[in-house]
């Protein structure tokens, strides 16, 4: 109803339950937010009758982690061994089925999907964020407890993926992708 009332030219869907530890405590809410929330946005897009450019964001955790050193590709399996990853994989599958069933045949809709990994910056002081936890512990002269200490975590400043999302939206709008 809101999308129909506002009639936006662009939709950027970045909403998510993004904390892995929370997904263990609140698995149903994580799936509801990440999968059903994405389906709700897609349902709103499916009912758009005007020209609209849409960018949906999931996560690099959408891929089934096979513990290799290379980046994942579009052809790699989605999934996950935990609720957060599984919810992001399920969101990707939901996007794909809406695309193939409805949106692909809608010439008025331009749709792109992007995935980012671990981001830092922008005032993110959420619980169970490694950089945040380190800063808080160091400021209190406390020992830092690292979850999954053998994991490799590539980082990017939040402005990098945001710039990419805006560029993707612009390129979709201009018909360059």
Specify the residue positions occupied by each region the protein language model found.
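NAD(P)H-binding glycine-rich loop region in Rossmannoid oxidoreductase-like domains
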Residues: 1-33
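CheY-like receiver
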Residues: 2-6, 44, 137, 164
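Residues in well-ordered alpha-helical elements
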Residues: 9, 21, 28, 39, ...
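Alpha-helical elements of Rossmann-like donor-binding domains used by nucleotide-donor carbohydrate transfer enzymes
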Residues: 10, 40, 93-97, 133, ...
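SDR active-site strand-loop-helix element
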Residues: 11-17, 54-59, 114-116
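Catalytic helix-loop patch of NAD(P)-dependent Rossmann-fold dehydrogenases
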Residues: 25-43, 52-53, 62-119, 124-126
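Substrate-binding strand-loop-helix patch
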Residues: 33, 120-128, 149-163, 177
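Alpha-helical substrate-binding/gating segment
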Residues: 103, 132-145, 155-177
């Amino acid at each position: 109803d809101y999308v129909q009332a506002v009639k936006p030219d662009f939709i950027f869907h970045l909403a998510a339950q993004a904390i892995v530890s929370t997904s263990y405590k609140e698995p149903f809410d994580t799936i509801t937010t990440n999968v059903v929330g994405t389906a709700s946005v897609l349902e709103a897009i499916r009912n758009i009758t005007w020209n609209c450019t849409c960018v949906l964001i999931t996560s690099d955790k959408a891929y089934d982690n096979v513990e290799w050193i290379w980046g994942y590709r579009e052809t790699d399996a989605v999934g996950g061994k935990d609720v957060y990853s599984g919810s992001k994989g399920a969101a990707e599958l939901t996007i794909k089925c809406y695309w193939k069933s409805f949106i692909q045949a809608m010439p008025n809709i331009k749709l792109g999907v992007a995935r980012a990994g671990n981001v830092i910056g922008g005032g993110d002081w959420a619980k169970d964020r490694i950089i945040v936890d380190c800063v808080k512990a160091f400021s209190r002269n406390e020992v830092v407890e690292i979850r999954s200490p053998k994991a490799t975590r590539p980082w990017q400043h939040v402005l990098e993926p945001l710039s990419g999302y805006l560029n993707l939206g612009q390129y979709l709008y201009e018909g360059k992708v």
